[in-house]
Each structure stands twice: as structure tokens, then as C-alpha cells.
């Protein structure tokens, strides 16, 4: 593995750990400059295509989910680990279905379900962008549904 600091081609593995069922985290040390860096290995699978609202298709990108979650959880008591856990959960749920295509609507619903469990404010933020809330009444209605749901528990 090439060193990201000095570009030397050889490094040794210091530590290997499974991060989830599909990836391995490796801590490496450059044999030239002795600096350490981390790499991740993942199983390569058939690429998943996402069907967008306009029916165009693009490759599934976990970073888009992560970015949306980061924006929704900004200034909220939600850790990066919790966000990463949601992304991994959604990826695993999609992979369990053995599908080659999925609609953005389905992914968005999965994200909202997990956010609703984690942080209601982040959920409303995400939902407002995802569902394109047009006015304050839409916000109020969404908040009412959350309050009603909480009352049922």
C-alpha cells in the first residue's frame, strides 16, 4: 500500500480489525518514513443503482446519506459514530434485499425512520428538505404527528 505521506510503495500492517461484516480496518506503517495511516478494505459487489425522482439513475453513494445526516444533525447531540452506524445499517438493509436498483424515496424513508428514533429535531430537519416542506403548516403538521406518536408510547 502506498504511503499517503511520502508515496513510498511499501508498508507493513500493524493491526487488522473487522469494522462490520463487509470491511476490514488496517493500521499501517510506512517502511520508509515510519508514519502510520489507516486503510479500509471492502468486498466489491455489483454496483447498486439509485433511481432518482426524475427517473435518472446513478451509482449508490453512501457519502450522500452521510452528508445528509451530518447536515440534519448539525449542532445536535449526535455523534459521528451514531451517524456512521445509521449509514452502515441502511447499507446492510439494502444489501439484504439483493437488489440492483432502489428508489431514492425508499432510501429517504429508511433515513427518516432511523433519525426519528435517534433525534426528533434532526428528523424534522431532514424531513423538511427531503419532503420539500413548502410552508410553516407542513412543519406544524409533522410536529403534531410526532407528538401524537409520542403520546401513544
Curated annotation (Swiss-Prot):
Domain of life: Bacteria
Cofactor dependence: Zn(2+)
Residue ranges occupied by any ATP-cone domain in the UniProt entry: 48-138
GO BP of this protein: negative regulation of DNA-templated transcription
Keywords: ATP-binding, DNA-binding, Metal-binding, Nucleotide-binding, Repressor, Transcription, Transcription regulation, Zinc, Zinc-finger
Note accompanying the cofactor annotation: Binds 1 zinc ion.
Entry keyword annotation includes Metal-binding: yes
One MF annotation (Gene Ontology) recorded for this entry: DNA binding
Zn finger intervals (unnamed): 3-33
InterPro entries linked to this entry: ATP-cone_dom, NrdR-like_N, RNR_NrdR-like
Protein name: Transcriptional repressor NrdR
Lineage: Bacteria, Bacillati, Bacillota, Clostridia, Peptostreptococcales
